[in-house]
């Protein structure tokens, strides 16, 4: 597993992970942790290039910073992306992703997003405690959609005020 940092102005940390054994090619962006650890979902898409994925992960991480601040969650903003075909998933891929998340030492907490479900996150959790939105049976908050919706409503109210 090779993890390397990518310098991006205005971001606390952006990193790339390539793990040939599992086929993982992923990016994590932490925009700001002033208010707390960076929270942001993990998505998996067949990006055309790493540059496209980098644009997406940084844009989304920055958005999470503002959404978290407006909703007064006590969290910062981050995001992760896996570059790949979401129809091709494996335990090894998600275990490697869990190790990548763990390498941030709690600075980034992941959750589900596009093409990532609770079963995928349960595998990630085998390698890191820094994952949320897991099943209620595992002692977590369950489906994060209500919290996402709440954040959107609070953001809209703040924009109107």
What role is predicted for each listed range?
Residues 1-142:
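N-terminal ligand-binding/catalytic initiation module
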Residues 138-157:
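A glycine-rich, Thr/Ser-enriched phosphate-binding loop motif common to dinucleotide/cofactor-binding enzymes
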């Amino acid at each position: 597993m090779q993890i390397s940092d990518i310098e991006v102005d205005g971001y606390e940390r952006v990193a790339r992970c390539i793990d040939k054994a599992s086929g993982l090619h992923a990016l994590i962006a932490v925009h700001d942790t002033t208010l707390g650890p960076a929270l942001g979902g993990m998505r998996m898409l067949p990006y055309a290039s790493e540059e496209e994925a980098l644009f997406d992960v940084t844009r989304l991480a920055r958005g999470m910073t503002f959404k978290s601040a407006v909703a007064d969650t006590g969290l910062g903003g981050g995001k992760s992306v896996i570059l790949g075909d979401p129809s091709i998933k494996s335990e090894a891929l998600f275990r490697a992703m869990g190790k990548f998340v763990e390498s941030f030492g709690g600075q980034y907490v992941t959750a589900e997003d596009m093409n990532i479900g609770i079963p995928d996150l349960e595998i990630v959790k085998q390698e890191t405690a820094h994952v949320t939105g897991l099943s209620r049976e595992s002692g977590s908050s369950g489906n994060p959609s209500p919290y996402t919706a709440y954040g959107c409503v609070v953001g809209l109210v703040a924009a109107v005020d």
